[in-house]
Amino acid sequence: MKRKLLSAALAAMPCIALAAGEANTLDAIVVVGQRSAERFDGEDVGSKRLTAQRAATSDTASLLRDVPGVSLYGAGAVSSLPAIHGMADDRVRVKLDGMDLISSCPNHMNPALSYIDPTNVGTIKVYAGITPVSVGGDSIGGTIVAETPAPEFAAPGQTGLFKGEAGVFYRSNNNARGGNIAATYATDAFNITYSGATSAADNYKAAGEFKTFTATGRGTNTLPLDEVGSSAYKTTNQTLGIAFKGANHLIEARLGLQDMPKQLYPNQRMDLLDNEQRSLNLRYLGQLAWGTLDARIYNENVKHFMEFGPDKKFAYTAGNTSQGMPMKTEGKTTGATIKANIDLSKQDVLRVGGELQQYRLNDWWPAVVGSAGMGPNDFLNINNGERDRTSLFGEWEQRLSKEWLTLLGLRFERVNTNAGMVHGYNLATFPTAGAGGMMNQTRDAVGFNNANRDKTDNNWDLTALARYAPSTSQDIEFGFARKVRSPNLYERYSWSTANMMSIMNNYVGDGNGYLGDVNLKPEKAHTLSATFDWHAANRDWEFKATPYYTRVTDYIDAVQWNGTTNVARSPLLTNQFVVLKYTNQSARLYGIDLSGRMPLARTGLGELGLKGLLNYTNGKNRDTGDDLYNIMPLNAKLTLTQKLGGWDNGVELVMVDAKSKVADARNEIKTPGYGLVNLRASYTWKQTRVDFGVENLFDKFYSLPLGGAYTGQGTTMGLALPWNVAVPGMGRSLYAGVNYKF
């Protein structure tokens, strides 16, 4: 049935192709030098699309669901990890207001997009094909650029500008609730803006029973068979911005604050019970005689704490009711960027720039009083971790003729990583000789401490793009890219082979444990991609097709590891959670993205339209023949839209094929196909907007293909949890939101 639905969606896509102020913003001073760049811009989600989704989600990454080629790894409720063409997390560069932010957590519970509420997103652009070197770097999957609203200034002669907005929302399934407020005061040269948002939710319920146990390990506390344990959250994000404008120059400062007292995880052994982030972002932007100059310095500090949440067994030590398995992480990022757009001629633009980033990480697990296995000393997971990047790039864009536009770019990145010596719970010193120790902690620490941990990678990126527009209704963009990514600190420097420790180093949500390798090489990806764009001259209808092929040398995959013998496991264990070690192998990915929209009719019921999206990705390990982990199966979405006066409504049909191609080495869980129907409506009247809808209208049960393994309740400190239980999707949920602008 699901394949028939998907086939129908695929057949419908070509039909789309065949259908015949008072305030000044930053954009007013930055125009020259950008005209050609827009031709190679990423997919712009757009303010209308962003606004339409805000009432339905508190997860900023989910705003990208309708972008061709994008899927989402399931994680916490507000921390999904975007994947582009099958590559996610650190393989995708995510920039937030120009800052490169790094997850400071062994489970990557605090990704960059978790620090911005959907209501505070001004623009999001996704570079899912060939990424220009001016926005790429240290990534192989693509780039996501998210920005808060640009500062606005009063018109010349106006005494002052005061504006803002406030909103609230509610969602029924998990009792999600929250609100946001933003306010701006500006003159023609000064701007101060505050924005704040808070949201919280309880555990959500699936559309049916998906597990065979109710126990949580917390005494008599149990969860219903349809309740997804460890899916609740609470978070608050605030931003304060100050900007000064003079002639063609802008100076801007932004302070960001996050207080997240909890975000529970249904696919991790631990839960986030505190995350505090502070960021300071300073920027200069100017339009000069020769082009534009953009310079920025920023700093971020993160304090992160994990423990067993209320749905997971807490007490593993007799007599100690105050500690389960505490884990602390502190990360500090300092960065600087400078970019210049130089107008060489009316046809040529040269972009040059440089970037610096310094990242420091400490990840330690405090001793548990009275525990033989988790004491008497702190466990040093990553001690004084360092990851420093220095990069330079140059990019030449040339308009050869009215029909042809080309782009050629080269980027150099030098990445230095290092980490200090470590010890386990059993020692207070840093061993360089010895063996054994409970759970092989001494042996593993000795091997790590004696290894050469200071690594330097010299990485080269290359992008060549061309765009051909033979008519006003057709564009073809095609190109080649070489992209390189160096391993992150957890891939290189997590060191324990023990089950209990390794399962805490996992940011893919598959329930397994992971062990690093100090000798990992950078991943090197070579991509061919093209986009065929047919459209009306006024874009009333359009149809896009993007085929792509990527081959990755030294792809960081994983092999099953025997902690006792400290070698790769053979034969492989099946149908259970295991320990794996990161290793360099070879991979290839290919696929196609289809998207389009068309008007249907103008009737007394309003303007009717149809839009659609279809994605397909295939990923394979070329060394082992295994399928790559967490590849989204064939999926499609068709939406019937209606607009009448202030009404803007839609009926969505979401279709996902079965996930049958899975990574055998990781014992990845297969998921069946499904189809969902969502209803969405909004009404705008003057300064007020009301959004409401129903997600999963028919309360259909389904498992999330990229949601990972369910580890949301019970005794999670080991490998013995029930295997083959996928995290299910949410059952029927009604939502409503109101926003008022003043």
What are these regions (language model features)?
Residues 26-61, 81, 89:
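N-terminal periplasmic "start-of-domain" segments of outer-membrane beta-barrel proteins
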Residues 207, 484-485, 558, 657-661, ...:
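C-terminal beta-signal and adjacent terminal beta-strands/loops
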Residues 270-289, 328-333, 381-389, 441-443, ...:
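Outer-membrane beta-barrel signature, preferentially recognizing the C-terminal barrel domain
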Residues 172-201, 212-261, 272, 276-290, ...:
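Transmembrane beta-barrel wall of Gram-negative outer-membrane proteins
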Residues 101-129:
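Short acidic/polar hinge/loop motifs at secondary-structure boundaries
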Residues 206-228, 306-327, 364-380, 418-454, ...:
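Solvent-exposed loop segments that connect transmembrane elements
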Residues 231, 235, 248-293, 301-333, ...:
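Flexible loop and strand-edge segments within Gram-negative outer membrane beta-barrel domains
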Residues 399-406, 414, 540-556, 561-664, ...:
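Gram-negative outer-membrane beta-barrel transporters
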